[in-house]
Structures are given as structure tokens and as C-alpha cells.
Design a protein with these regions (language model features):
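Surface-exposed beta-loop interaction hotspot
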Residues: 128, 133-160, 167
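Intrinsically disordered, low-complexity, positively biased terminal segments
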Residues: 1-13, 20-25, 45, 56-57, ...
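Short Pro/Gly-enriched beta-strand edge/turn motifs at strand-loop
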Residues: 34-39, 172-175
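N-terminal, Lys/Arg-enriched amphipathic/low-complexity engagement segments
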Residues: 38-42, 46, 66
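Conserved catalytic-core motifs of GNAT/GCN5-like acyltransferases
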Residues: 107-111, 126-140, 261-273
């Protein structure tokens, strides 16, 4: 990514520079300071396909932010953290300006906390929706009955191109490298078939305090429930998290299987709406709030 324009100390002594893998232990410490659940392994996985900016003061990491470039027209931004001791000093604004450098022709997506929303609005982001974070000890969910011609089955590694195409259609941006990494590392990936053609999929992955279900791509809410119920059953009696779209229609059902709502970050976009084809699959649950 371009060198930050603030690579000389500002009046407060803060220097922005490209983030490297050597920063990850310190970045994890920053997120832990805010009580975010990310493990060191979660940081490593998210950084693998990212570009990052680190903010230092007196040789100490005080802020981070990552961006992911998808194709030629899209990007996501996440894991924007400023240590509480340095908040209120416009470090977040300088960090975001550096992350947005060179993205003027891209549609940029992020999920905002209530604390960060005002900053993102000042930088040109607009609210497009909301994510509902549900989590808890998953209860065995009744399996969702599928109509004739529909079935669930395990995904094979040779199906990567089909899963990448489904994800791109549902998310509105091509994320081939991310889907490839997730398929390799997921504890389970289940595919929803209709007439022997894949029309949806979902993954169960180690993340944070336990496991996370996501992404979940399906043609409709019943298909999404079938995928989620299967994976929640695999992880029954264990901590499970899922981040769903506000309009998914799944919130009440998720609470019935023990996954209660705990947060509701705002979905924001800069540079125009995401183009999701009508009649195609929908993204019912995101990967993480950082990467979308």
C-alpha cells in the first residue's frame, strides 16, 4: 500500500507506518485491551490477505488498521483500534485517511462500532444496514426439513471455484483468496445442493472464544437455517458465534437455539452501493466484522 503521508512524527509524537507481521503480537494486545475476543491466530489469519497501517509513539504500538483489496473495484476495512490512552487525539482519523489512500475508485465496506460511526461519516461513509452479533452455548437445533431435490453435504476441496462464485455473488465483491483460506482452515464446510447443483454453503471455524459460523450463503432463509442448524449441531454445547445481516430474518430463530444477540454494529459503505445480483444467493452471515 502507499507509504503513509504521516511517516514523520506529528506534534504528539505519533508516527504512521506500514504494519508488518512482527506487529501482530502487539496488535493482539491492543485488541485484548478493548476486550475484543480475537486470538493471535485470528490476527494472523486476517493479516494474511491484508495491508495494514500501524501507529507508533515512542516505539510503542498505539493503533492499527487493516484493509483488504478485492478485485479491482472493492475493499474492506477493519480491526481499526486506538489504545484508550491515546483516543481523542485524531489518531483514528489519520489512520483511516492512510487506509483510504488509493481507494478513491473502489467501493469500501466496513462495520462500525457506535464510537467510530461519527468518524466514518465524516470520511464519506454512509449507513447501509446493520449486523447482529449472536453468541452463546449452542443448543442442538432441530434439523430443518428440506424439500425434495435439496440436500446438505460436506464440501470438497475441489469445489473451491464454486464456493468462491457463490460468495462473490452474495457479498457483491470477489474474495477468492479469503474463501480459499477459510476452506483450508475451517473445521467444517457444508454445501446446500438443489438438483445436484451447489446453491449455498456455510463454514464452522475456530474464532475468538470458541467457534464462529460464517460465511453463510444461501438462496433463502430456510436454506440458511438448514446450513446453520447442521453446523450448530456439530458444535452443540460449545461457545458459538454468528454475525447475521439485520434483514436476514434469523434473529428469533437463533435465540431459540441459545445464540443471543449481544451487539449490533453498523454496516457502512463509501463509493457507491455493493452490486448484488437480483435472484442470486444472499449473504446471511458474514465472516467477521473486520473482513465482512
Amino acid at each position: 500500500m502507499p507509504e503513509p503521508t504521516s511517516n514523520t512524527p506529528a506534534m504528539d509524537g505519533v508516527v504512521l507506518r506500514p504494519m508488518t507481521a512482527a506487529d501482530l503480537p502487539h496488535a493482539h494486545a491492543l485488541s485484548a485491551e478493548l476486550r475484543w475476543p480475537h486470538r493471535p491466530a485470528d490476527w494472523e489469519q486476517m493479516f494474511a490477505n491484508a495491508e495494514g497501517i500501524a501507529a507508533e509513539r515512542d516505539g510503542e504500538l498505539v493503533a492499527t488498521g487493516l484493509r483488504w483489496l478485492w478485485g479491482e473495484s472493492h475493499a474492506t476495512i477493519g480491526l481499526v483500534i486506538v489504545t484508550p490512552a491515546c483516543q481523542g487525539r485524531r489518531i483514528g482519523h489519520r489512520l483511516m485517511s492512510a487506509l483510504l489512500a488509493g481507494l478513491e475508485d473502489r467501493t469500501v465496506l466496513l462495520h462500525a462500532t457506535s464510537e467510530g460511526r461519527g468518524l466514518y461519516e465524516r470520511l464519506g461513509f454512509v449507513r447501509t444496514g446493520e449486523v447482529r452479533q449472536h453468541q452463546g452455548i449452542a443448543q442442538p437445533a432441530p434439523l430443518v426439513a428440506l424439500q425434495p431435490g435439496w440436500r446438505l453435504r460436506p464440501a470438497g476441496l475441489n469445489e473451491l471455484p464454486a464456493l468462491q462464485a457463490l460468495d462473490a455473488a452474495a457479498r457483491g465483491m470477489p474474495r477468492d483468496a479469503l474463501v480459499a483460506e477459510l476452506l483450508q482452515s475451517a473445521d467444517a464446510c457444508v454445501v446446500l445442493d438443489h438438483d445436484n447443483e451447489p446453491v449455498g454453503f456455510a463454514m464452522l471455524r475456530r474464532f475468538g472464544r470458541g467457534h464462529s459460523i460464517g460465511p453463510v450463503v444461501a438462496p433463502d432463509a430456510e436454506g440458511a437455517k438448514a446450513l446453520i442448524a447442521h453446523l450448530a449441531g456439530l458444535n452443540a454445547s460449545n461457545f458459538t458465534r454468528i454475525d447475521i445481516d439485520f434483514d436476514s430474518g434469523l434473529a428469533e430463530w437463533l435465540e431459540s437455539i441459545g445464540l443471543l444477540r449481544v451487539d449490533a454494529p453498523t454496516t457502512m459503505v463509501r463509493g457507491g452501493p455493493l452490486a448484488v445480483p437480483q435472484g442470486g444467493p444472499s449473504l446471511f452471515a458474514i465472516v467477521t466484522q473486520a473482513v465482512g
